[in-house]
Structure formats: structure tokens, C-alpha cells
């Protein structure tokens, strides 16, 4: 088996020849948020939003757009290295997150709905992880 970091894995964009069997998350002090939006308990996700804040640095990942999960790099740039996020900065970051990635429509959800979900849950997630 081989190990790789998350950024390298996400850069593969579905070009995998192996099966992902493990995810290793090193323990560190920080706050995190995860939301899986689905229609029923057993459904595949319509959208996934994951946010972590460690030492003033934020990581924002969006999955099930439907596509391979991606880091929201512009969103991360807009909030990183700030002591405390203002309400306006959170709203701006949520807007950036909804705009910087592409979304597609499927039977489960439209692209517009996914985009709206990302905006709402990035806002909620940033509010949650930036609490003191």
C-alpha cells in the first residue's frame, strides 16, 4: 500500500488505479465541522462540506458536487491567518466557496441547489469552527 497526503489525492481527480482503503487523520488541536446532506439516511450525499481550523489556518473541502472532492482554495485564502472571523468575512467566504467550484445536476439534486447548499453550510461551518 502507499500513502499520500490529501492534496495529492484530490489532485488525482478520479484517475485512480487503486482502491482507497484507509484515511489517516493526525490528531491535532483545532476545531472542525462536517456536514453530509442527503435525502434519506441511506442515500449517497447530495453535497459534503468539511472545514477545519488549526492554529488560525482553515481547510475547506467540498465533495459530492458530483465530482471528486476539492479543496476550496480561494475560500481558504480569504479566511486564513485571521484571528477571528467577522460576520462579513464569513458571508464573503461562503459566497466565494459557492462560486469557485463547479456543480452538476443529477437525479438527486440540481447544480443550483448544490451551490446554495455549499453557501449555507460553509457559512455555518465557518461560524462553528471560528467560535472561541
Question: For each predicted feature, which ranges?
Answer:
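C-terminal structural segment of proteins
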Residues: 1-132
Amino acid at each position: 500500500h502507499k500513502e499520500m497526503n490529501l492534496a495529492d489525492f484530490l489532485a488525482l481527480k478520479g484517475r485512480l488505479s487503486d482502491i482507497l482503503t484507509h484515511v489517516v487523520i493526525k490528531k491535532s488541536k483545532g476545531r472542525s465541522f462536517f456536514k453530509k446532506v442527503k435525502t434519506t439516511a441511506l442515500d449517497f450525499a447530495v453535497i459534503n462540506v468539511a472545514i477545519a481550523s488549526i492554529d488560525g489556518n482553515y481547510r475547506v473541502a467540498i465533495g459530492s458536487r458530483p465530482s471528486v472532492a476539492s479543496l476550496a482554495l480561494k475560500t481558504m485564502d480569504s479566511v486564513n491567518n485571521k484571528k477571528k472571523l467577522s460576520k462579513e468575512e464569513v458571508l464573503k467566504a461562503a459566497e466565494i466557496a459557492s462560486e469557485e467550484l463547479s456543480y452538476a445536476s443529477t437525479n438527486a439534486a440540481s447544480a443550483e441547489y448544490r451551490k446554495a447548499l455549499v453557501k449555507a453550510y460553509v457559512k455555518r461551518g465557518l461560524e462553528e469552527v471560528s467560535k472561541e
